Amino acid sequence: MQTRNTFSWIREEITRSISVSLIIYIITWASISSAYPIFAQQNYENPREATGRIVCANCHLASKPVDIEVPQAVLPDTVFEAVVKIPYDMQLKQVLANGKKGALNVGAVLILPEGFELAPPDRISPEMKEKIGNLSFQNYRPNKKNILVIGPVPGQKYSEITFPILAPDPATNKDVHFLKYPLYVGGNRGRGQIYPDGSKSNNTVYNATAGGIISKILRKEKGGYEITIVDASNERQVIDIIPRGLELLVSEGESIKLDQPLTSNPNVGGFGQGDAEIVLQDPLRVQGLLFFLASVILAQIFLVLKKKQFEKVQLSEMNF
């Protein structure tokens, strides 16, 4: 009886431990996976401001390149690739929220013309699915199917992100026309420097909030520092809190000025935005162009044959 109770207790403890671990994993993964897009989605109705600036730049302060490749023209009701490239040095490591170093993640927002949207799974070819990998795209808003977001995802695997896009058909959507359309993209690598509420992350420089002498630097138990600055003129003390993961540039007894950097800049990432143009091509116009080109080629052939025939007639008359 004693043995049975012991085994039962062990089984319950193991089950409880596994359950807790799974819950922690799910919560952590959910918070990480939704972190980047949800900041913009919660605070901005549209990710592109009237000035053309994409709102992700409000949190990711460093400027880095981003590129997008799309076909020059597409036919209605066809699926095409929009490839967003977010280049960076794969050897770089960033400061994570816990103060440790880790690999960079990437994220992107793609703003398509009205009517263009994410292609349904049954319209995506096997070749395109292989390029997409395990990426899961989402609409910026339920009613904004033309704005897509993705991230954060591992940068080492997805520095090139392939969006499968379905072109609209003017025959079924009267708001769409056969025209040249602009599209816009924003892409980031690494964590941001500022949260939407205006507070700093631990992925940026921390400056002195007062000038004076550093009287004390206290290293906190869970990481980070408390720097006490004494103003020599009035003996007023100011304590600056430095989060974990940052490298100090100052020491006790040092004289510093207002806004002087207390830490080095840990940020190795950044945000960039770009644009491209795509033509929604009328199939009848393409057919007309092909017919015209065929007519020109046939006319050239007939002209050459006629010239050959004329030369033969002239040659025969001369021989006669």
UniProtKB/Swiss-Prot annotation:
Subunit arrangement?
Answer: The 4 large subunits of the cytochrome b6-f complex are cytochrome b6, subunit IV (17 kDa polypeptide, petD), cytochrome f and the Rieske protein, while the 4 small subunits are PetG, PetL, PetM and PetN. The complex functions as a dimer.
Biological role: Component of the cytochrome b6-f complex, which mediates electron transfer between photosystem II (PSII) and photosystem I (PSI), cyclic electron flow around PSI, and state transitions.
Q: What GO biological process terms are annotated to this protein in UniProt?
A: photosynthesis
Which source organism? Arabis hirsuta (Hairy rock-cress)
- The question of whether ATP-binding is a record keyword is answered with no
Gene this protein is translated from: petA
Positions binding heme in this chain are 36, 56, 59-60
An example Gene Ontology CC term for this record: chloroplast thylakoid membrane
Record's protein name: Cytochrome f
Enumerate the transmembrane spans.
286-306
- Span of the signal peptide: 1-35
List the InterPro entries hit by this protein, alphabetically: Cyt-f_TM, Cyt_f, Cyt_f_lg_dom, Cyt_f_lg_dom_sf, Rudment_hybrid_motif
Q: Which domain of life is it from?
A: Eukaryota
